[in-house]
């Protein structure tokens, strides 16, 4: 049985103003060994260290956030374009229709993938806030998370409608519909936020050391418990753990698709596709990857899997990814 915790109980502490959420040392990917098997598919040069990536369906482009900035990489053989931004982004999300949003200190950037133009959006009253995560709800509203553990739901491009501050740090945000979901690595927890953004709905412990979070089109949440060696699958209405499956070799990178959940194994430079439809993950396919395969993205229209190296070893493109 999985215990459900309502985060409003946090407010019942004797001194809530001074309370700091208890934390553990955050987990992270394994330091990958040198590649000994040729990566599947094609490897495109990308000397920067990839941090996050998203595929934009409208422009058929992969947008990669690297240690040195932002790169737009068209599908096929199109030349990549580097995009200049005024300050270092921390995370990104997209709408699938040609816009990508990148969190940064004091606000976020809106990138037009077609033109490469960048607009800077300053969140009112939060010029000094270190925003660490960003997601977009189905109603178009953006949600931002911060290094000091707050979640901000915007009512316009720059205005905050509501906020809640109960986390050690907001390490990742995703959405299912108008529900935002927070991953806090220090608390190794996942938490759903009320649609109005003013409070938490439910929270669950996520293994022994959760590191990454993804959402899929079937309404599921995928979590890599890297320290515990597991793939965790949650439902969101209400938040409930549906599946927990052992995955060895430091699972880290995640992307959910219509048919498979893809997980990268950073200790062995492998990516594995799991079918979740039966109620327990079933491995369907695995591919050798580039070194340090920390970042995954997927093009559903062409079944193309992208594996981006965070050690500067390129971006791997696997066409028609999946079981044969």
Which role does the model predict for each range below?
Residues 1-5:
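Sec-dependent N-terminal signal peptides
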Residues 8, 12-324:
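Predominantly soluble domains enriched in secretory-pathway, periplasmic, or organellar proteins
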């Amino acid at each position: 049985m999985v215990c459900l915790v309502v985060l409003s109980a946090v407010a019942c502490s004797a001194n809530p103003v001074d309370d700091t959420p208890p934390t553990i040392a955050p987990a992270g990917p394994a330091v990958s060994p040198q590649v000994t098997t040729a990566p599947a598919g094609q490897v495109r040069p990308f000397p920067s260290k990839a941090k996050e990536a998203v595929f934009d369906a409208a422009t058929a482009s992969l947008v990669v956030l690297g240690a040195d900035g932002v790169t737009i990489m068209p599908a096929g053989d199109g030349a990549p374009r580097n995009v200049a931004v005024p300050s270092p982004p921390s995370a990104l999300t997209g709408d699938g229709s040609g816009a990508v949003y990148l969190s940064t200190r004091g606000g976020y950037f809106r990138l037009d993938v077609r033109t490469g133009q960048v607009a800077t959006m300053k969140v009112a009253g939060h010029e000094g806030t270190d925003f660490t995560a960003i997601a977009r709800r189905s109603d178009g509203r953006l949600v931002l998370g911060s290094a000091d553990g707050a979640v901000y739901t915007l009512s316009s491009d720059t205005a905050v409608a509501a906020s809640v501050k109960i986390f050690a740090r907001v390490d990742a945000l995703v959405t299912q519909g108008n529900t935002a979901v927070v991953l806090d690595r220090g608390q190794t927890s996942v938490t759903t936020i009320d649609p109005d953004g003013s409070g938490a709905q439910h929270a669950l412990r996520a293994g022994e050391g959760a590191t990454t979070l993804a959402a899929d089109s079937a309404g599921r949440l995928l979590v890599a418990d890297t320290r515990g060696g597991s793939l965790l699958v949650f439902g969101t209405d209400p938040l409930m753990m549906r599946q927990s499956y052992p995955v060895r070799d430091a699972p880290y990178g995640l992307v959910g698709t219509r048919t498979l959940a893809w997980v990268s194994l950073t200790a062995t430079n492998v990516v594995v596709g799991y079918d979740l439809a039966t109620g327990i993950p079933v491995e369907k396919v695995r591919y050798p990857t580039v070194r340090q395969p920390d970042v995954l993205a997927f093009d559903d229209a062409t079944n193309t899997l992208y594996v981006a190296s965070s050690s500067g070893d390129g971006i791997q493109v696997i066409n028609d990814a999946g079981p044969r």
